[in-house]
Amino acid sequence: PSRGLGDVYKRQIWRWPLACALAFSAAAWSEAVSLERNQAEVQAVTFKNPVVWADVPDPDVIRVGDYFYMVSTTMHLMPGAPVMRSRDLVNWETVSYLFDELHETPKYDMEEGTVYGRGQWATSIRYHDGKFYALFSPNDVPYRSFVYTTDDPAKGWTLHSRMKHFHDASLFFDDDGRVYVFYGTGQLTELEADLSGVKEGGVDMTLQVRDEEEKGLLEGSRVIKHDGKYYLLMISWPNGGKRRQLCYRADKITGPYEKKVILCDNFAGFPYVGQGTIVDDAKGNWYGVIFQDRGGVGRVLTLSPCHWIDGWPMLGDEDGR
Protein backbone atom coordinates (compact mmCIF):
# COMPACT_ATOMS: atom_id res chain seq x y z
CA PRO A 1 0.00 0.00 0.00
CA SER A 2 1.00 3.61 -0.51
CA ARG A 3 2.75 5.51 2.28
CA GLY A 4 3.36 9.20 2.70
CA LEU A 5 0.86 11.63 4.15
CA GLY A 6 -0.41 8.99 6.55
CA ASP A 7 3.07 8.68 8.04
CA VAL A 8 3.21 12.45 8.44
CA TYR A 9 -0.09 12.40 10.32
CA LYS A 10 0.73 9.35 12.44
CA ARG A 11 1.24 10.16 16.12
CA GLN A 12 1.94 13.77 15.18
CA ILE A 13 0.75 16.62 17.44
CA TRP A 14 0.38 20.16 16.10
CA ARG A 15 0.99 22.92 18.63
CA TRP A 16 -0.15 26.43 17.77
CA PRO A 17 -0.75 28.64 20.85
CA LEU A 18 -4.29 29.91 21.15
CA ALA A 19 -3.00 33.39 21.92
CA CYS A 20 -1.12 33.95 18.66
CA ALA A 21 -1.35 37.32 17.01
CA LEU A 22 -3.18 36.57 13.76
CA ALA A 23 -6.93 36.05 13.66
CA PHE A 24 -9.97 37.00 11.63
CA SER A 25 -11.21 40.47 10.66
CA ALA A 26 -14.23 41.59 8.72
CA ALA A 27 -12.11 42.10 5.60
CA ALA A 28 -9.22 39.67 5.67
CA TRP A 29 -9.62 37.67 8.87
CA SER A 30 -6.31 39.02 10.13
CA GLU A 31 -7.26 40.96 13.25
CA ALA A 32 -8.51 39.87 16.66
CA VAL A 33 -12.25 39.39 16.85
CA SER A 34 -14.71 38.79 19.61
CA LEU A 35 -16.32 35.40 19.80
CA GLU A 36 -19.79 35.16 21.31
CA ARG A 37 -19.85 33.47 24.72
CA ASN A 38 -23.61 33.84 25.09
CA GLN A 39 -26.18 36.51 24.45
CA ALA A 40 -25.03 38.59 27.42
CA GLU A 41 -21.26 38.03 27.49
CA VAL A 42 -18.56 38.60 24.87
CA GLN A 43 -14.91 37.70 25.39
CA ALA A 44 -12.00 38.33 23.01
CA VAL A 45 -10.05 35.27 21.90
CA THR A 46 -7.29 35.22 19.29
CA PHE A 47 -5.57 32.44 17.39
CA LYS A 48 -3.41 32.05 14.31
CA ASN A 49 -4.63 30.82 10.95
CA PRO A 50 -4.12 28.37 9.43
CA VAL A 51 -4.40 26.43 12.68
CA VAL A 52 -2.86 23.39 10.95
CA TRP A 53 -0.11 24.03 8.38
CA ALA A 54 -0.64 20.73 6.59
CA ASP A 55 -3.01 19.09 4.14
CA VAL A 56 -6.32 18.61 5.99
CA PRO A 57 -8.93 18.30 3.22
CA ASP A 58 -12.69 17.91 3.63
CA PRO A 59 -12.79 18.20 7.44
CA ASP A 60 -15.71 17.04 9.52
CA VAL A 61 -15.72 17.84 13.24
CA ILE A 62 -17.89 16.81 16.17
CA ARG A 63 -17.69 17.43 19.90
CA VAL A 64 -18.18 14.66 22.44
CA GLY A 65 -17.82 15.90 26.01
CA ASP A 66 -14.68 18.02 26.31
CA TYR A 67 -13.07 16.67 23.14
CA PHE A 68 -13.46 17.63 19.50
CA TYR A 69 -12.91 14.87 16.94
CA MET A 70 -11.99 15.59 13.32
CA VAL A 71 -11.61 13.34 10.30
CA SER A 72 -9.95 14.24 7.01
CA THR A 73 -9.13 12.91 3.54
CA THR A 74 -6.03 10.92 2.51
CA MET A 75 -7.24 9.71 -0.91
CA HIS A 76 -4.87 6.94 -2.14
CA LEU A 77 -2.56 7.11 0.90
CA MET A 78 -2.71 4.45 3.61
CA PRO A 79 -3.32 4.08 6.49
CA GLY A 80 -6.31 6.20 5.58
CA ALA A 81 -8.74 8.74 7.03
CA PRO A 82 -6.88 10.15 10.05
CA VAL A 83 -9.01 10.78 13.13
CA MET A 84 -7.73 13.67 15.23
CA ARG A 85 -8.62 14.89 18.72
CA SER A 86 -8.44 18.33 20.33
CA ARG A 87 -9.65 20.22 23.38
CA ASP A 88 -9.56 23.66 21.74
CA LEU A 89 -9.91 23.26 17.92
CA VAL A 90 -6.32 24.55 17.56
CA ASN A 91 -4.01 21.84 18.92
CA TRP A 92 -4.73 18.50 17.25
CA GLU A 93 -3.41 15.00 17.90
CA THR A 94 -3.91 12.06 15.56
CA VAL A 95 -5.36 9.18 17.60
CA SER A 96 -6.28 6.64 14.91
CA TYR A 97 -7.07 5.88 11.27
CA LEU A 98 -10.31 4.40 10.00
CA PHE A 99 -8.47 1.71 8.05
CA ASP A 100 -4.98 0.36 7.43
CA GLU A 101 -5.56 -0.70 3.83
CA LEU A 102 -8.22 -0.82 1.14
CA HIS A 103 -8.45 -3.70 -1.31
CA GLU A 104 -11.31 -2.62 -3.55
CA THR A 105 -9.14 -2.83 -6.64
CA PRO A 106 -5.62 -4.09 -7.47
CA LYS A 107 -4.77 -0.49 -8.30
CA TYR A 108 -4.41 0.23 -4.56
CA ASP A 109 -1.31 -2.00 -4.74
CA MET A 110 -0.20 -0.30 -7.99
CA GLU A 111 -1.19 -3.33 -10.02
CA GLU A 112 -3.12 -2.81 -13.28
CA GLY A 113 -2.80 0.94 -12.78
CA THR A 114 -2.93 3.45 -9.91
CA VAL A 115 -5.51 5.36 -7.88
CA TYR A 116 -3.58 8.59 -7.35
CA GLY A 117 -5.97 11.35 -6.24
CA ARG A 118 -8.84 8.92 -5.79
CA GLY A 119 -9.51 6.55 -2.87
CA GLN A 120 -11.02 7.78 0.41
CA TRP A 121 -12.66 11.20 0.29
CA ALA A 122 -14.78 13.42 2.54
CA THR A 123 -15.63 11.23 5.53
CA SER A 124 -18.57 12.06 7.81
CA ILE A 125 -18.06 11.43 11.55
CA ARG A 126 -20.92 11.22 14.06
CA TYR A 127 -21.59 10.16 17.65
CA HIS A 128 -24.87 8.46 18.57
CA ASP A 129 -25.98 6.46 21.62
CA GLY A 130 -22.46 5.94 22.93
CA LYS A 131 -20.88 4.94 19.63
CA PHE A 132 -18.85 6.77 16.99
CA TYR A 133 -19.71 6.30 13.31
CA ALA A 134 -17.74 7.25 10.20
CA LEU A 135 -19.00 7.00 6.61
CA PHE A 136 -17.08 7.60 3.40
CA SER A 137 -17.23 6.63 -0.26
CA PRO A 138 -13.99 6.00 -2.19
CA ASN A 139 -13.87 7.99 -5.39
CA ASP A 140 -13.22 4.92 -7.52
CA VAL A 141 -14.68 1.56 -8.50
CA PRO A 142 -16.77 -0.21 -7.37
CA TYR A 143 -18.24 3.06 -5.97
CA ARG A 144 -19.60 1.84 -2.64
CA SER A 145 -19.62 3.37 0.84
CA PHE A 146 -17.87 2.17 3.97
CA VAL A 147 -19.32 2.58 7.48
CA TYR A 148 -16.90 2.19 10.40
CA THR A 149 -17.73 2.22 14.12
CA THR A 150 -15.94 2.38 17.47
CA ASP A 151 -16.62 3.03 21.14
CA ASP A 152 -13.38 5.02 21.39
CA PRO A 153 -11.59 6.58 18.39
CA ALA A 154 -8.23 6.14 20.15
CA LYS A 155 -8.70 2.36 20.17
CA GLY A 156 -9.29 1.75 16.47
CA TRP A 157 -12.26 1.25 14.19
CA THR A 158 -14.26 -1.75 12.92
CA LEU A 159 -15.89 -2.05 9.50
CA HIS A 160 -19.64 -2.11 10.14
CA SER A 161 -21.31 -2.22 6.72
CA ARG A 162 -21.09 -1.49 3.00
CA MET A 163 -23.75 0.17 0.88
CA LYS A 164 -24.25 2.31 -2.21
CA HIS A 165 -21.97 5.21 -3.12
CA PHE A 166 -22.70 8.59 -1.49
CA HIS A 167 -20.51 11.43 -2.80
CA ASP A 168 -19.30 13.88 -0.10
CA ALA A 169 -21.82 12.48 2.36
CA SER A 170 -23.06 13.66 5.74
CA LEU A 171 -24.48 11.04 8.07
CA PHE A 172 -27.35 12.28 10.24
CA PHE A 173 -29.17 10.74 13.21
CA ASP A 174 -32.50 12.46 13.80
CA ASP A 175 -34.21 12.85 17.16
CA ASP A 176 -36.92 10.33 16.25
CA GLY A 177 -34.38 7.53 15.72
CA ARG A 178 -34.40 7.68 11.93
CA VAL A 179 -31.06 7.83 10.11
CA TYR A 180 -30.29 9.68 6.88
CA VAL A 181 -27.42 10.53 4.59
CA PHE A 182 -27.16 13.82 2.68
CA TYR A 183 -24.85 13.70 -0.33
CA GLY A 184 -24.12 14.92 -3.84
CA THR A 185 -26.05 18.00 -4.91
CA GLY A 186 -28.88 17.91 -2.39
CA GLN A 187 -29.58 14.18 -2.43
CA LEU A 188 -31.23 12.74 0.71
CA THR A 189 -31.58 9.01 1.42
CA GLU A 190 -32.90 7.26 4.52
CA LEU A 191 -30.86 4.38 5.96
CA GLU A 192 -31.80 1.45 8.13
CA ALA A 193 -31.62 2.35 11.81
CA ASP A 194 -28.70 -0.07 12.29
CA LEU A 195 -26.85 1.38 9.26
CA SER A 196 -26.92 -1.96 7.50
CA GLY A 197 -28.04 -0.38 4.24
CA VAL A 198 -30.57 1.84 2.51
CA LYS A 199 -34.06 1.62 4.04
CA GLU A 200 -36.52 0.05 1.65
CA GLY A 201 -39.43 2.43 1.11
CA GLY A 202 -37.69 5.19 3.07
CA VAL A 203 -37.04 8.78 2.07
CA ASP A 204 -35.06 8.97 -1.17
CA MET A 205 -35.21 12.33 -2.90
CA THR A 206 -33.36 15.32 -4.32
CA LEU A 207 -33.81 18.52 -2.34
CA GLN A 208 -34.51 21.75 -4.20
CA VAL A 209 -31.15 23.44 -3.64
CA ARG A 210 -30.51 24.79 -7.13
CA ASP A 211 -31.52 28.28 -8.21
CA GLU A 212 -30.42 30.88 -10.76
CA GLU A 213 -27.06 31.25 -9.01
CA GLU A 214 -26.47 27.61 -8.14
CA LYS A 215 -26.36 25.88 -11.50
CA GLY A 216 -22.93 24.32 -11.13
CA LEU A 217 -21.41 21.86 -8.70
CA LEU A 218 -22.68 21.72 -5.13
CA GLU A 219 -20.86 19.37 -2.76
CA GLY A 220 -19.28 18.93 0.66
CA SER A 221 -22.49 18.20 2.57
CA ARG A 222 -22.45 18.73 6.34
CA VAL A 223 -25.70 18.61 8.35
CA ILE A 224 -26.65 19.64 11.87
CA LYS A 225 -29.91 20.22 13.72
CA HIS A 226 -30.11 23.40 15.79
CA ASP A 227 -33.10 24.83 17.65
CA GLY A 228 -35.40 22.42 15.85
CA LYS A 229 -34.24 23.36 12.34
CA TYR A 230 -32.16 21.37 9.85
CA TYR A 231 -29.03 23.05 8.49
CA LEU A 232 -27.31 21.71 5.39
CA LEU A 233 -23.90 23.22 4.56
CA MET A 234 -22.45 22.87 1.06
CA ILE A 235 -19.97 24.68 -1.15
CA SER A 236 -20.68 26.07 -4.59
CA TRP A 237 -18.95 27.70 -7.53
CA PRO A 238 -21.49 30.18 -8.95
CA ASN A 239 -21.15 31.04 -12.62
CA GLY A 240 -18.19 33.40 -12.98
CA GLY A 241 -17.59 33.39 -9.21
CA LYS A 242 -15.35 31.76 -6.65
CA ARG A 243 -15.99 29.00 -4.17
CA ARG A 244 -18.21 29.93 -1.26
CA GLN A 245 -19.90 28.27 1.71
CA LEU A 246 -23.67 27.97 1.55
CA CYS A 247 -26.20 27.06 4.20
CA TYR A 248 -29.69 25.71 3.59
CA ARG A 249 -32.22 25.49 6.42
CA ALA A 250 -35.65 23.95 6.81
CA ASP A 251 -38.23 23.07 9.44
CA LYS A 252 -38.56 19.53 8.07
CA ILE A 253 -35.75 17.28 6.91
CA THR A 254 -37.40 16.93 3.50
CA GLY A 255 -37.72 20.70 3.11
CA PRO A 256 -38.51 23.12 1.67
CA TYR A 257 -35.07 24.65 2.24
CA GLU A 258 -34.08 28.32 2.04
CA LYS A 259 -30.52 29.42 1.19
CA LYS A 260 -27.98 31.82 2.67
CA VAL A 261 -24.35 32.52 1.72
CA ILE A 262 -22.56 32.26 5.08
CA LEU A 263 -18.95 32.66 3.91
CA CYS A 264 -17.56 34.29 0.77
CA ASP A 265 -14.18 35.95 1.13
CA ASN A 266 -10.50 35.76 0.35
CA PHE A 267 -8.17 34.96 3.25
CA ALA A 268 -4.55 36.06 3.67
CA GLY A 269 -4.12 36.70 -0.05
CA PHE A 270 -5.12 33.19 -1.10
CA PRO A 271 -8.26 31.93 -2.88
CA TYR A 272 -11.56 31.77 -1.11
CA VAL A 273 -12.02 29.53 1.90
CA GLY A 274 -14.64 26.83 1.53
CA GLN A 275 -15.86 23.39 2.61
CA GLY A 276 -16.07 22.31 6.19
CA THR A 277 -18.51 22.39 9.06
CA ILE A 278 -19.62 24.24 12.18
CA VAL A 279 -19.38 22.99 15.75
CA ASP A 280 -20.08 24.29 19.25
CA ASP A 281 -17.99 24.05 22.40
CA ALA A 282 -19.16 23.09 25.89
CA LYS A 283 -19.95 26.75 26.68
CA GLY A 284 -22.22 27.24 23.70
CA ASN A 285 -19.76 29.11 21.46
CA TRP A 286 -19.82 28.20 17.77
CA TYR A 287 -16.98 27.96 15.27
CA GLY A 288 -16.43 27.23 11.60
CA VAL A 289 -13.76 24.69 10.66
CA ILE A 290 -13.01 25.16 6.97
CA PHE A 291 -10.15 24.28 4.63
CA GLN A 292 -8.37 26.58 2.19
CA ASP A 293 -6.26 25.66 -0.84
CA ARG A 294 -2.59 26.63 -0.38
CA GLY A 295 -0.95 25.17 -3.46
CA GLY A 296 1.79 22.65 -2.73
CA VAL A 297 1.09 22.72 1.02
CA GLY A 298 -2.37 21.34 0.36
CA ARG A 299 -5.71 22.31 1.85
CA VAL A 300 -4.88 23.87 5.20
CA LEU A 301 -7.25 24.09 8.16
CA THR A 302 -8.75 27.43 9.19
CA LEU A 303 -10.84 28.35 12.21
CA SER A 304 -13.39 31.17 12.35
CA PRO A 305 -16.03 32.47 14.73
CA CYS A 306 -19.59 31.47 13.92
CA HIS A 307 -22.30 33.94 14.91
CA TRP A 308 -25.96 32.95 14.83
CA ILE A 309 -27.69 35.93 13.20
CA ASP A 310 -31.41 35.74 12.44
CA GLY A 311 -31.15 31.98 12.65
CA TRP A 312 -28.20 31.70 10.24
CA PRO A 313 -24.68 30.51 11.21
CA MET A 314 -22.58 33.33 9.76
CA LEU A 315 -18.83 32.68 9.52
CA GLY A 316 -16.33 35.49 10.11
CA ASP A 317 -18.52 38.55 10.55
CA GLU A 318 -22.25 39.11 10.12
CA ASP A 319 -21.81 39.32 6.33
CA GLY A 320 -19.78 36.12 6.01
CA ARG A 321 -16.52 37.98 5.34
Q: Where do the model's predicted regions map?
A:
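Single conserved hydrophobic/aromatic residue that forms the stacking wall/gate
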Residues: 1-9
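Carbohydrate-active catalytic/glycan-binding domains of CAZyme proteins
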Residues: 10, 29-321
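Bacterial N-terminal signal peptides
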Residues: 17-25
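Bacterial N-terminal signal peptides that target proteins for export
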Residues: 10-17
